[in-house]
Curated annotation (Swiss-Prot):
Protein family (similarity comment): Belongs to the ABC transporter superfamily. Macrolide exporter (TC 3.A.1.122) family.
Protein name: Macrolide export ATP-binding/permease protein MacB
Pfam families in the cross-refs: ABC_tran, FtsX, MacB_PCD
Span of domain ABC transporter: 2-243
Organism: Rhodopirellula baltica (strain DSM 10527 / NCIMB 13988 / SH1)
Residue ranges that the Swiss-Prot or TrEMBL entry lists as coiled coil: none
Keyword Transmembrane assigned: yes
TM regions (residue ranges): 248-268, 275-295, 563-583, 615-635, 644-664
Taxonomic path: Bacteria, Pseudomonadati, Planctomycetota, Planctomycetia, Pirellulales
Length: 684
């Protein structure tokens, strides 16, 4: 079964090659029970490692059941170990966080023999029962005695039905009674199952149990003694014939990947505090991404809602200073006749209304309130702002505008501050000392682009605010670009002409958002012609889309800055993950060697550690999503900034976190996958 021809193994020590095996030629028949003996440094352990394909010979040939092991590639060697070799180690090499059943099932992860998980569980259970541990399936290694742990190691070695069982000092850490039990188990496996057994030992009693003893000295076979003829039934050796190496199981198959995820979670739980601290950078980075995206999405939504509430087709015309056709500089005034001209002569204009602003204090009984905005206008303005359908009452009429009637309409906020839950219609309030009757309450609008309350407003006829409210205090408008107020006028009980009164702005609604630019051009031409001025600088015409663009650019800039900071945090988190994964590779070097010994190839090891890094980042990502959402809600409430949840935010965050795990976990995973199995098993 085993043929060794001139097998050599040299180790490089400094500038020199140190020969350990100096040309071993040895044949071992199928079903033989062989003991390898020799003093320390004789080469017996090195020979066992070569037999188990854990190490590569420097020279010579090694055939097992007709397979030229010396010529196999690393991938084929992994499949060879999985299919043909079983290992029993002196120190057991059990996974500390896995149950007895899971430890025995470890080789099946890397096997490609077609067994289902249920079949693997059944086989592992039978093996544990056969070694006397049927009642210990769910026990952890630290809950078992040394003999029980070695029995688990033997059951694990038999899990893939190997042709060759290699045992390195299997009784070295056991008491005398347990040693005899293990030796009896070896004899049973050899005689009843026909397994070829090679045991490395210093103990003469252990060697006495073998059919054949091979003594080594100075890297050569010094003595080869057959103690007794093999008693194995030759009919049981039929299955020991060579089988073609099966295609290795895919490292990324669903069962293998799921097992890797489970192992990753167990490994991360092993050092919970270190895991949390490692994830902190990812958590902060993802939380920054989520909060930034939600706050910016909320701001964008607020901008859109404000544009919709104020009108995407809205323009405001304010006076400026310009040169007349004669070349003289003079201030420009806007009068109600200009409003009429704009409405009648500009085909792109749907609605035009005058605007008069005031700074006022409102008083009702013992309640006082200063609204954000006190505005005089006409009913056309209310219609353009979708305020013609009031929550309570009715809009003021054109007749009331002409009469400068003492009426007003309150926003929801003002109505609440002055009347609380009382019915306000028909009640009287004082506006800068002028008594006005409440005729309506506006429907709720909410905050504007920058968070100002659009419902903190009082609206009345522009004539009322111009001739009564503003004149009552001698106040001037709050806008420096407006002309000085005209002297207060004696109000008459009859209607009077107000078409030459100065107003502060003109509110215009274009026929559609597409007509805004045309409306701007037409308005400039009409007003410049009416006032005999050059168009440049005479009027400032603004539309809400310009304001929205500016605010949007500011929000975009702040969001970009936040995302840059989040990216830096993710980079720091990624470096931390790389560091901790390198530490994990070092701590689990023996585990890596064990997995390779039972059939794991480089791709499987790479997958294992890559998944661990990814799991670390994805878990941190989910925590970051929750933390980021809570942070954005908190910030929004504290500073009054709107927030909006986005389905893309968590998707982007998890994707970025997983990418960080893959990118920064690749180097540690690659480092683990390139370890030499024998070096990994020897690592202390």
């Amino acid at each position: 079964m085993i043929q060794l021809y001139g097998l050599r193994k040299d180790y490089r020590v400094g500038d020199h090659d140190l020969p350990v095996l100096k040309g071993i030629t040895l044949n071992i028949e199928a079903g033989e029970y062989v003991a390898l003996m020799g003093s320390s440094g004789s080469g017996k352990t090195t020979l066992m490692n070569l037999l188990g394909s854990l190490d590569h010979p420097t020279d010579g040939d090694y055939h097992l059941a007709g397979i030229d092991v010396s010529s196999l590639t690393p991938l084929e060697l992994a499949a060879f170990r999985s299919q043909h070799i079983g290992f029993v180690f002196q120190n057991f090499n059990l996974l500390p966080r896995a149950t007895a059943l899971d430890n025995v099932m470890l080789p099946t992860i890397y096997a490609s023999d077609g067994r289902s998980r249920r079949e693997c569980i059944e086989d592992a259970t039978k093996l544990l029962e056969s070694v006397g541990l049927g009642g210990r399936l769910d026990h952890m290694p630290n809950q078992l005695s040394g003999g029980e742990r070695q029995r688990i190691a033997i059951a694990r070695a038999l899990m893939n039905r190997p042709k060759l069982l290699l045992a390195d000092e299997p009784t070295g850490n056991l008491d005398t009674v347990t040693e005899q039990e293990i030796l009896a188990l070896f004899r049973q496996l050899n005689q009843e199952h026909g397994i070829t057994l090679v045991v490395v030992t210093h103990d003469a009693e252990v060697a006495h149990e073998a059919d054949r003893v091979v003594r080594m000295k100075d890297g050569l076979v010094a003595e080869d003694v057959r103690q007794r003829a093999s008693t194995v039934d030759r009919s049981r050796l039929a299955n020991s014939r060579a089988e073609p190496l099966r295609e290795p199981a895919s490292a990324w198959s669903l069962p293998a990947t799921w097992n890797a995820i489970v192992v990753a979670v167990l490994a991360l739980r092993r050092n919970a505090l270190r895991t949390v601290l490692t994830m902190l950078g990812v958590i902060i980075g993802v939380a920054s991404v989520i909060s930034t995206m939600e706050l910016s999405a909320g701001a964008s939504t607020a901008i859109e809602e404000t544009v919709a509430s104020m009108g995407a087709s809205m323009l405001t015309i304010s006076p400026g200073k310009a040169s007349s056709t004669s070349g003289r500089q003079r201030p420009i005034q806007i009068i109600p006749d200009d409003v009429v001209a704009v409405a009648e002569q500009c085909s792109a204009v749907k609605v035009a209304a005058p605007l008069v602003y005031s700074q006022v204090q409102l008083v009702r009984q013992n309640r006082r309130w200063s609204p954000n905005l006190a505005l005089g206008t006409t009913s056309q303005y209310l219609a353009a702002r979708n305020w013609d359908q009031l929550e309570l009452g009715t809009p003021f009429t054109q007749e009331q505008v002409l009469d400068a009637a003492k009426v007003c309409i309150l926003g929801k906020t003002v109505a609440h501050e002055l009347f609380d839950s009382e019915y306000p219609i028909g009640e009287e309030i004082r506006v800068n000392g002028v008594p006005l009757r409440v005729v309506g309450v506006l429907t709720e609008k909410g905050g504007d682009v920058i968070g100002n309350d659009q419902d903190d407003i009082i609206i009345g006829p522009w004539t009322t605010f111009k001739l009564r409210v503003n004149s009552s205090t001698g106040a001037t408008a709050q806008f420096s670009t407006f002309a000085d107020q005209m002297p207060p006028m004696q109000l008459a009980s009859t209607r009077r002409s107000t078409q030459r009164e100065e107003i502060h702005q003109i509110y215009v609604e274009a026929e559609s958002p597409d007509h805004v630019e045309l409306a701007r051009q037409q308005i400039t031409q009409v007003l410049s012609r009416r006032h005999n001025v050059e168009p440049a600088g005479a009027y400032r015409i603004n539309d809400i889309t310009e304001v929205s663009k500016v605010v949007g650019q500011v929000v975009g800039g702040v969001s970009a800055l936040g995302l840059v900071i989040a990216g830096v945090s993710l980079m720091v988190g990624g470096v931390g993950i790389m560091n901790i994964m390198l530490v994990s590779v070092t701590e689990r070097t023996r585990e890596i060697g064990l997995r390779m010994a039972v059939g794991a190839n480089r791709s499987a090891i790479l997958r294992q550690f890559l998944i661990e890094a990814t799991v670390l980042c994805v878990v941190g990502g989910f925590i970051g999503i929750f933390a980021g959402h809570m942070w954005s809600v908190l910030v929004g409430r504290v500073i009054g900034w709107p927030t909006a949840m986005s389905i893309w935010a968590p998707i982007v965050a998890v994707t970025v976190a997983a990418t960080v795990g893959i990118v920064f976990g690749y180097y540690p995973a690659r480092t683990a996958s390139r370890l030499n199995p024998i070096d990994a098993l020897r690592y202390e």
